[in-house]
Amino acid sequence: MDTEDDPLLQDVWLEEEQEEEEATGETFLGAQKPGPQPGAGGQCCWRHWPLASRPPASGFWSTLGWAFTNPCCAGLVLFLGCSIPMALSAFMFLYYPPLDIDISYNAFEIRNHEASQRFDALTLALKSQFGSWGRNRRDLADFTSETLQRLISEQLQQLHLGNRSRQASRAPRVIPAASLGGPGPYRDTSAAQKPTANRSGRLRRETPPLEDLAANQSEDPRNQRLSKNGRYQPSIPPHAAVAANQSRARRGASRWDYSRAYVSANTQTHAHWRIELIFLARGDAERNIFTSERLVTIHEIERKIMDHPGFREFCWKPHEVLKDLPLGSYSYCSPPSSLMTYFFPTERGGKIYYDGMGQDLADIRGSLELAMTHPEFYWYVDEGLSADNLKSSLLRSEILFGAPLPNYYSVDDRWEEQRAKFQSFVVTYVAMLAKQSTSKVQVLYGGTDLFDYEVRRTFNNDMLLAFISSSCIAALVYILTSCSVFLSFFGIASIGLSCLVALFLYHVVFGIQYLGILNGVAAFVIVGIGVDDVFVFINTYRQATHLEDPQLRMIHTVQTAGKATFFTSLTTAAAYAANVFSQIPAVHDFGLFMSLIVSCCWLAVLVTMPAALGLWSLYLAPLESSCQTSCHQNCSRKTSLHFPGDVFAAPEQVGGSPAQGPIPYLDDDIPLLEVEEEPVSLELGDVSLVSVSPEGLQPASNTGSRGHLIVQLQELLHHWVLWSAVKSRWVIVGLFVSILILSLVFASRLRPASRAPLLFRPDTNIQVLLDLKYNLSAEGISCITCSGLFQEKPHSLQNNIRTSLEKKRRGSGVPWASRPEATLQDFPGTVYISKVKSQGHPAVYRLSLNASLPAPWQAVSPGDGEVPSFQVYRAPFGNFTKKLTACMSTVGLLQAASPSRKWMLTTLACDAKRGWKFDFSFYVATKEQQHTRKLYFAQSHKPPFHGRVCMAPPGCLLSSSPDGPTKGFFFVPSEKVPKARLSATFGFNPCVNTGCGKPAVRPLVDTGAMVFVVFGIIGVNRTRQVDNHVIGDPGSVVYDSSFDLFKEIGHLCHLCKAIAANSELVKPGGAQCLPSGYSISSFLQMLHPECKELPEPNLLPGQLSHGAVGVREGRVQWISMAFESTTYKGKSSFQTYSDYLRWESFLQQQLQALPEGSVLRRGFQTCEHWKQIFMEIVGVQSALCGLVLSLLICVAAVAVFTTHILLLLPVLLSILGIVCLVVTIMYWSGWEMGAVEAISLSILVGSSVDYCVHLVEGYLLAGENLPPHQAEDARTQRQWRTLEAVRHVGVAIVSSALTTVIATVPLFFCIIAPFAKFGKIVALNTGVSILYTLTVSTALLGIMAPSSFTRTRTSFLKALGAVLLAGALGLGACLVLLQSGYKIPLPAGASL
């Protein structure tokens, strides 16, 4: 779809830094380990180092450390790191087409799947034949059917006349007169009714030779064609120069075009655009739209649409409306195509016009009886309505707009300009229509342009939440970086720059021109993911206070943090990249874009953050430290909790220097700590909380320099892990095993989706409209002439009996059931009130439409709130639509002291169980109107429970209950104003005498999936297509050159009958084997006996058959037969897949029964719905394959990173527990496994492994500096290393988890459903991951981790060899399975 939205994320790629990354990775493995320096004390992280004046030592790492700590070099790195991405993005925006937002369903189609290729082949064949393709194809060119008739005539002449000359054989190419009248009943009736029209049509049907038609198949030389009911139906002859634009015009055209539709003087005569309206009944249990209150509301809404500013400049103005005089005030604009044309007719000059412009509601039942005599009526209502059940839960309407617009010569004259004008106009309806829903009627609005506008607006509004997410994360980063503005700025900036790099790669390098709607998730997720790496770098740098030399400290930070973030970014990027193998373009693009962003984010942080940390430590750290120190001295108190001694350790310079030269650098892992502790006895598995500081170290006097919040968080984590990894580690492992078993049980119960996927929030206008499209009758048919304006002629008001022959031709329907006519008063009535007052008893009031006063009733005198009488309407009139019922009862009255009857008013039906019977009813207003007065009514809560009407509440205090059905107020016309003159259409019943005739039979209106059986087409050729995205060259059709229609005509007719007879697959009357027009079946039965009595489809008048043939160069090239399937389009893809298999197996059985050499054996069945179901089926399958692939990548990466099986095992167990628990929570939440859930699961493994890997990295670093007194006991070593690992990385991973959750929380409030669900899954997974890392992973490390293992180059090579060996064994196993015939599923939905 076209769009003008700017891209939300813009990234570029630093190609020059790839070599640096590779060099960094190689040096990771090749560097050597330094030895500890005796007597070296810890260095305060806030110390201001002097500038490095000496040149760097030889070696890559020394040069790198010097560059990042030299202010000039660090500043240059920051400048280049910011300027290069911005320069690349500027180059992209200036010299490449702008990125668009792809909101089309095409982005989710699997173009290489068999179902898609089949349907695309048919679509391309239809486009090449007719110029457009769509379910509505109202302007399907009749020249094809005429040409087919001519070919059949030639075949018949060759069969019966033998050798005739070529000139004689070409003579029948002028359509025979028999084809004009035809044997069909419609043709005879039309000819009888409109002889003039037939003569006119006969003159226009003379056509040029067949060669001319074949040369330009998209042109129709006829000026008009006669429709089945005698109306003229002009074709649309496009000009060759504007064929592309004209094809769009033809797609929206109907058979009700007019002879001068393309003459420049006839502005807006072509119905080209539309707004779809659906009115849903709500607010009561009955849900019937045909009530007076709801119909009046709908009529008011349609009038507001016509009164909207600018409507007359864009409305549809067909020539038919010129005969409707009341439409003159609207410049003869066509009213909405709606049943309101029957319910609100107008009267002018003694004639009734069914145009919906009247002010008064006609008789509802009589109007429905009149409308139901037309098959077109069923287009407006749901499938439950019938002659015996005049109720519908919804009502459809169409607002039509015409082209060409004023000041344009034709539709093709500056078409894009006309389209832009209409789009800017039509979106002004959104604000108005969004406010029209009431408590009784819900208004849904749609149409192509409005739908696109709604989707774009929804997407943009959801993207605004990303700015809220980024702002919250920026504030949190500021806090967690000890309120360092400098580090916070460059931390967030590095993420933004990575987005520019990734966007540059995505758009320029990979050549993708569109951002899919799923890519919007990146705006939320990447900030949370990218901040993880930022925290690791900052935390690692601050932890390395034991390194005095700033260069060594920077080298340690780059190596340690770079390695840890590399593996975590690798696993996360691999999890997203697993979706690249999906054949669904939207999922493929989402996986590619996210993997690029994660990779570029790691690279940007690797380059930017060391330089920022170098400048910060030289110049900004002392300033921030002094500010925070003064603030904390005044505002904070010291904590009473103990903390590991070296956290607060400040160096005390003894002898003037804490260090004697640089520490020898020997390996890539710098010791984390230089702490010597005295031996402490451990009892019951406890580890001493207080550690003895080495000599020369004392607790710092000010904790504010480290940030009070971070100190408290680190202290809390220390106590937490002391409990989980030492004291209660076996309890945690037991709970973990129990939860894992239960999770496996519940996760196995998660079922595939049972309904179509939600794209938007369920209560939104867009989603409700999409849901209804699965259930609506003829959701793809534009019935622009189904209203009473076109179906009914103006007729005299004095004669309500319809005598039109057009109505009598509707036979075979069920006659209306005999019923007494309900005679409603056509004028306002008066309700008279009288009363009986007995001593000692309350007054009882009588309500009557009769002014007489039988004894003992007495007239009510005005005053004291009494109301002698009031005016009412006996039928809905204007805003007087609230119905009140007067109920009468004799129960509970004493005959001696009271009258024999009592009355009450209610808004509901009379309660027969309590003795109340219906007396009469009337209509009032619920809001104050002009010239009205307000009255109150109530029912006594004491015997005899009678009712009363009065002027004010003090006189109606019969009940203290709140307003309800028997108590409240209403407005009635004021008696001082002259009575309004009711129009002649008020309560008008067109069927008041003998009725309107039989109701029409419900036609076939496309409620199921339309399946096409195609012959003569082999497939589609896309070899020349560059498949970067769904938008591009669709390819070309590959035809079957050996296909001969007349040779296979008998088999085709047999297949048509066989498929139509299968009631399990095809609906009754759903077979459309032939194209529309001119009784082709009467010719076919002469060619072969099998072609006699072909099934006839039951279509709407004007609805064209979906069957089609392709004619080229004087021969039939292909044919497609259409069948309305019993498949319900609202089912889930997994349920519908069984219907697809039934169709496929049945057709193959029929084709295999054909003769061996028949070309029909290459036929196939296809359906647009099959494309849709395979989107989700293959999407889920590819996502699950991606889950397995990402799991394998993560296992391999973690194995190489940890280099020990006992370190790999805790990580794998944690990942398994995390994924199973998340899936279990999804099951408990009532979710099902759809495409969104499967895609989310595929990235869970990569995001779950991050925190565990960081913890294992801390465990390995702690082993590099194991205290001597801990080296004796293996259990003590494991526990100490686990505690040190949490102390090292705990704050970083908790901060990362917190930012990730905050980044995804705004996704919860998105209207786009995949966004919201994706955000919930990511937030849930992040929460479970950090919880399992701090509990299960620490407990498992404290139990099974190797106590004295340290990572070496040898262990790395062994782990790498084991991974390669395992990969080779897995590949060999796959080959063995393939040789044995086992099929291995692939992400593309196929199998090996």
From Swiss-Prot:
Q: Name one GO biological process term.
A: positive regulation of neural precursor cell proliferation
This entry's comment on induction and repression of expression is:
Up-regulated by thyroid hormone T3.
For this UniProt record, give its keywords in alphabetical order, as a comma-separated list: Cholesterol metabolism, Cytoplasmic vesicle, Differentiation, Endoplasmic reticulum, Glycoprotein, Lipid metabolism, Membrane, Nucleus, Steroid metabolism, Sterol metabolism, Transmembrane, Transmembrane helix
The record's account of tissue expression is: Expressed in brain and testis.
Q: How does it sit in the membrane?
A: Multi-pass membrane protein
Q: Transmembrane region positions?
A: 74-94, 463-483, 485-505, 509-529, 574-594, 596-616, 730-750, 1183-1203, 1205-1225, 1292-1312, 1321-1341, 1359-1379
Q: Which PANTHER family match?
A: PROTEIN DISPATCHED HOMOLOG 3 (PTHR46687:SF1)
UniProt comment concerning the protein's domains: The SSD (sterol-sensing) domain is necessary for the increase in cellular cholesterol uptake.
Per its record, how is this protein called by name?
Protein dispatched homolog 3
